[in-house]
Amino acid sequence: LTLLSTSAVADMLGITQQTVSRISREGVLPYEICGSRRVYNLNDIDEYMRRENLSRAPHDHPRMVDDLPEITAISFFSGALGLDIGLEEAGVPILLHAENDTKCRMTIDTNSPEAALLGDVNSLGVEQVRTYARIPSGREVDVMVGGPPCQSFSTAGARRAFDDARGNVFLRFLELAEEIQPRYLVIENVRGLLSTAYPLKPGGNPVHGGALRLILNRLKSMGYGVSFNLYNSANFGSPQMRERIIVVGKRDGTIAPWLTPTNSSDPIWSLPQWRTFREAASSIDGEQHFTQFPDKRLRYFKMLSEGQYWKDLPKNAQALAMGKAYRLSGGKTGFYRRIWWDKPCPTLVTSPTMPATDLCHPTENRPLSIEEYRAVQEFPKNWIVRGGLTDVYRQLGNAVPIALGKAVGQTILNDMIGIDTSIPYRDFPYSRYKRTSNITWKMP
């Protein structure tokens, strides 16, 4: 029999002692009183973690092996490791993951225990990063990747850019890159980064596109040549329409090529067609787990068929179904949306039941399951994502599609040996938007 204190349980679960006390009072965690203090049976804590799909909250730790691969790469804001898996599939091994979110850290440590693990980017320095990754001072860091929190730049949010704490970690990431000096610096972010307003001078007025200009100016001052574009992941073999900016900086000042597409919806490019939700879902076997639509919304989903949305409801039901959103401007195409079987899935979001970005199964009266999320993002079947249902949706919904990460890795590896496989695709429509690349993007 092993008894644990409240502080020991908090450390195991990665939560505060106050939270341990609260869930104990709520009857979630069994305990005994010893003197004036609560004590916990280790077996009860292990059972709680099993029930809640948790692992012991990992502490920061160095890489577990000493050998150094030919290519050295480190990852920040690693999340559930979508970008990292893609890079590794391309042949870019990730030696270190840095992530601050407790559930994501559990996911990382469960699936990639031998890699180094660090936390908050604000507290990291170049020596600690190199020491934990076991990259000696005489050896270059070949690739540094990161997808800094995108909420500060998202078109769906207030877009406070660098005035938001999450935006400030973006700036710290750039400072850390300047200290580490990787040969290749990869930044992944949302489309909103192209247009987020920010002052170009202290005390100045916000300028449309100012956030991206600030980043580009910073990279230029570091001596990096920069290429970027907005990429639809469906063009790289992902069964999902997800558009993300990929910025690639090169320390030698030259410009990296754009990614090389592998799929297209247009036969003119002689590439395989976009992959579909049906293809992704066909790989699923066994029980599926999903949240539920509220009954008051479910009744309207039952009126809709595959590929339909709120405008396909009976006229007399549309205003009732939409409520206040009925009078909003814009297409509102995500409301009451049933996805198509034979098209790529729309962008996965952190919850499939958010009204403006509904993700309803084509024929069943339910949201997409976490197994369908996993299949659409192309995570390996044996990949364990820690936490409850909400946590798993969030981690998978925030992840970079693995196919897109693989395209990034292949582009970098080819560029290292002087090969540009994107030349035949100079005019390829990488996304549905115009003026989104380092050649065509301009501030108004």
Question: Model features per residue range: what roles?
Answer:
Residues 224-235:
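Conserved S-adenosyl-L-methionine
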Residues 84-85, 151-155, 193-196, 237-241, ...:
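Short catalytic/ligand-binding loop motif for oxyanion handling, primarily in non-cytosolic enzymes
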Residues 25-33:
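Short, solvent-exposed alpha-helical "recognition" segments
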Residues 7, 12-18, 22-26, 38, ...:
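S-adenosyl-L-methionine-dependent DNA methyltransferase catalytic core
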Residues 131-134, 241-248:
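Short, surface-exposed amphipathic charged segments that create phosphate/polyanion-binding patches used
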